[in-house]
């Protein structure tokens, strides 16, 4: 049967979607294996966090979902350390920070009384932010101390209900630290702080002045006075200091601390466990970029890239600075670091590059990505790691999709043909990327072959690989065919709106999909139901056009969805932020590409 959630933690009878349980162990994509492991661990964690101890009311749903998300990483790290699951947590934290940088975000602890308001609480804040804050607290207290506090909390409230206050009290009592003062600043108020770092040498030490304020993507709000304050456990390390971070508690608007050694840079989120953004001086960004690969851990490199991108988003840095840092990490072969960079390079290419500069940007990307592809190779090697397999598929896709590299696109058509003729002959990582790349210039014959695979798939993974290749077709007739197919009885209702949303989030399908939704709204709602319709509302946040924003505003003002009211506000804000970012950075990017992209074109 169709199942709206991925899984459900019923005591003694956990239920799952088939795709979260059934996988070809030999061929299955590593990313799907990780997702399956994560969901299973999440639901098992709910047996304690949610079932044994249950929140008193829905306003504390994060006690269930945040704890289960935090806990789900633990058994996977112990079972498969080679998957580097902690790095995926850091990437996920970056996505959560994006949502929490919107003015329309909410506090973790949020009042809710109606069914629609309650449904809205099951979001990235309840899961992602709550888990990130718990990881920060665990790092601040130490694993053993934090675990002792969790045990005390569970023992005191087992087979009963609890609140956030109950948890803070248990941790404060166990740790003898002011947890009950620190955590409410992250749980009871919305948003995220940015900690600005300024350093100056004083003999053989470095004075580090930290200043905190709330971070907004909205530039006017970010620059306006704001009286919010957090009590922030912050860990730092300097270029001249020890490997072990210096951890302090920032409780005021501005405080100065001293680190050993005279450093030319100070990393403001050492270990990458802090839930905050960091703002650096321009000269420190350059110094950090130079030393990043040698002196920062992969997690710290990801957090640094996230912080620099945030500074670009609010105009503190030109987009060229981010590209320069990415270029400086050109020899980095850590799967998670590269994955994080490629996500932003895709965003830049889709939203910030003008049509006149597209060829230059793609040429720069080919120059950047080709050495990576050469290193990982087109085919797997005996004994290679799961990280290497994942990296190959990710770089392959970026080279074909973002850079439109002719060799990658030719290889994609070849691999797709092999996978369609004999699915067992190709790894699912490469097959999924190849299907999507082949679809870009694909015709009706390829479309029909993918439909046949959807109907005759021997595993849920094969089914979804083919299904979610369909939104990549750029032929207008095939785009329309996918939209009609999505709301037909041939597609399961649990998948229908995600398929429509994926078409809507592709450059070629954006306008046709939105027009389709406007013309077929009653059918879309019938297929997805009132709660699932929020999938479409959230999908509009990928638009970057004032006219389409106005259409979204008019339509969802007339067709309100109670369970997606905040999602709607966030989508409008994301559109506005993108429009503003494009207006601020497009010319700067053109200038940067004039110097770097043109040189790449000439090679």
Give the residues covered by each predicted segment.
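Short, glycine- and charge-enriched coil/turn segments that flank and shape catalytic ligand pockets
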Residues: 173-177, 201-205, 242, 293-295, ...
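Beta-strand-rich binding/interaction modules
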Residues: 179-180, 190-269
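Long, ordered, helix-rich scaffold segments
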Residues: 93-94, 211, 224, 245-247, ...
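Short, glycine-/Ser/Thr-/acidic-enriched flexible segments
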Residues: 21, 75, 202, 213-216, ...
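Domain-wide signal for the mature, well-folded portions of proteins, strongly enriched
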Residues: 18-19, 52, 96-100, 105-111, ...
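Amphipathic repeat-derived elements
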Residues: 41, 45-50, 174, 233-238, ...
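A short, hydrophobic secondary-structure junction motif
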Residues: 39-40, 231-241, 373, 442
